[in-house]
């Protein structure tokens, strides 16, 4: 065997060494590989295929990664054939790499990963989204921390129509934000570390994030979920934008755009106007109350028993707002669901109801009138039963009397004792799985001076707002006090006051 190949396969060491020694070995190995690449550049360019076939990316991930980095920077690998070979090797690497080794060389891993989704075009967008999604989940299987790669990837996936491959990543709940100064005294290769301890700007597994980038990520996630008709996930994503904590009680433009979409998606999801969470800042609530008023009126009209009110409000916002904000199709979908929710809500009054009576008691917001025939009602109800939005069955009496809809109990109401117990156990297991995350978060927050200062300021601001509210009960507010904040550096931590 070529002695140079021996250098590439000298790491990782045999099992049995502790994390500190493993990390030190990784740094020494990276230095030797760097020297090998520098002194044997021509050999690597000419023999890259043979070298990478010999170096298993799942076992010798660090060496494989550093060879990939060299080839990406090499002017000799610019032909179409070379690009295809390089893309093949990169795909193998991102699907197989050893996450423990990669933690020891975060900057190189990030640089190579960026090439997978860059405009350089080594991969078609569909392949790039699938590969980068797999790589990020391989680095952090919990998917609990957002990175700069998440932000770039969701934009690529949405803009190129490759949302499906992204879902395994964006469906993961984000718990952590990466920040400078989060590194631990423990070696990065310690597999017991929580994600923020090894994924942060210091380890270079992510770049620094701004508040604008995080808001954009959640907003695009919401759009991706809308595209897939995943209403609960879309609603949650937009709500994260709406309730985003900003410095000095500000509110960004993207938050107001998210608020409008949040209202529309909320109507589709629950059939009624959503209520702002308590965590929404007072400043944001004031801005939403004015800039989002047309959408709020549209949502209130959704509760009307006649479709005419909803149609009129739709015409108002369609002429002024919907086209400019990209909400035309979403609002039209709300119109289409108006009658569906009227039918669903009949279960609050009836156990069963004839299709003729459904025709009389419900209206289409698309036409502003009841459906023209009982057959049309029959088709609508059957489609709702088929897609799972309506728990019911159409009964057709043998004596020829009119067909009727029987409402069935929801799956939760019809659970047996055994099924209910299994559901409780599942919830308890989920809570138990969160315990180490909560413990790690509490430890970090308890020792974070900026967080403590921020908490004290929030309490002070809340008390001040309450006092001002008592003093000016019934009064208005000054629109000039609005602060539209476009960007805030999250890496600098929360402001000290």
Curated annotation (Swiss-Prot):
GO cellular component: COP9 signalosome; cytoplasm
Domain of life where this protein originates: Eukaryota
Keyword annotations of the record: Cytoplasm, Nucleus, Signalosome
GO biological process, one term: ubiquitin-dependent protein catabolic process
Alphabetized Pfam families for the sequence: COP9_hel_rpt
Positions of the PCI domain: 233-408
Location(s) in or outside the cell: Cytoplasm; Nucleus
UniProt function note: Component of the COP9 signalosome (CSN) complex that acts as an regulator of the ubiquitin (Ubl) conjugation pathway by mediating the deneddylation of the cullin subunit of SCF-type E3 ubiquitin-protein ligase complexes. The CSN complex is involved in the regulation of the circadian clock through its control of the stability of the SCF(FWD1) complex.
UniProt subunit comment: Component of the COP9 signalosome (CSN) complex.
Family, per entry: Belongs to the CSN3 family.
Name of the featured protein: COP9 signalosome complex subunit 3
């Amino acid at each position: 065997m070529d002695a140079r190949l021996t250098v590439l396969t000298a790491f990782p060491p045999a099992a049995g060494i502790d994390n500190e020694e493993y990390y030190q070995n990784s740094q020494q190995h990276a230095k030797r590989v760097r020297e090998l690449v520098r002194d044997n550049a021509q050999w690597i360019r000419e023999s890259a295929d043979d070298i990478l076939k010999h170096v298993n990316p799942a076992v010798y991930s660090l060496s494989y990664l550093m060879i990939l980095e060299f080839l990406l920077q090499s002017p000799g690998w610019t032909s179409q054939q070379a690009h295809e070979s390089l893309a093949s090797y990169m795909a193998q690497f991102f699907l197989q790499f050893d996450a423990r080794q990669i933690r020891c060389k975060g900057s190189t891993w990030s640089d190579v990963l960026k090439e997978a989704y860059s405009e350089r075009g080594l991969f078609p967008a569909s392949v790039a989204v699938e590969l980068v999604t797999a790589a990020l989940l391989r680095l952090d299987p919990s998917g609990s921390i957002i990175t700069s790669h998440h932000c770039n990837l969701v934009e690529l996936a949405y803009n190129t129509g490759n949302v499906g491959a992204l879902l395994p990543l964006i469906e993961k709940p984000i718990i952590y934000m990466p920040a400078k100064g989060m590194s631990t005294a423990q070696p990065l290769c310690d597999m017991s570390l929580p994600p923020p301890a090894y994924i942060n700007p210091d380890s270079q597994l992510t770049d620094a994030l701004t508040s604008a980038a995080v808001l954009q990520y959640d907003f695009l996630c919401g759009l991706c979920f809308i595209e897939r008709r995943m209403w609960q996930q879309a609603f949650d994503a937009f709500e994260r934008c709406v309730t985003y904590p900003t410095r000095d009680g500000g509110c960004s433009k993207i938050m107001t755009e998210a608020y409008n979409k949040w209202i529309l998606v909320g109507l589709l999801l629950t059939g009624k106007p959503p209520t702002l969470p308590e965590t929404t800042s007072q400043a944001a609530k004031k801005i939403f109350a004015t800039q989002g008023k047309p959408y709020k009126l549209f949502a209130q009209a959704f509760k009307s028993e006649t479709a005419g009110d909803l149609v009129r409000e739709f015409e108002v916002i369609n002429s002024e707002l919907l086209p400019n904000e990209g909400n035309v199709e979403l609002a039209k979908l709300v119109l289409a669901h108006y009658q569906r929710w009227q039918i669903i809500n009949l279960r609050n009054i009836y156990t069963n109801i004839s299709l003729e009576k459904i025709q009389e008691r419900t209206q289409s917001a698309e036409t502003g009138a009841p459906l023209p025939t009982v057959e049309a009602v029959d088709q609508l109800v059957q489609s709702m039963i088929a897609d799972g939005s309506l728990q019911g069955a159409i009964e057709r009496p043998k004596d020829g009397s009119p067909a009727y809809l029987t409402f069935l109990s929801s799956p939760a109401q019809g659970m047996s004792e055994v099924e209910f117990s299994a559901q409780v156990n599942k919830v308890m297991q989920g809570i138990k799985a969160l315990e180490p995350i909560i413990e790690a978060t509490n430890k970090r927050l308890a020792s974070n001076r900026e967080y403590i200062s921020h908490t004290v300021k929030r309490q002070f601001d809340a008390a001040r707002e309450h006092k001002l509210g008592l003093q000016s009960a019934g009064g208005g507010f000054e629109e000039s006090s609005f602060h539209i904040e476009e960007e805030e550096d999250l890496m600098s931590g929360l402001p000290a006051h």
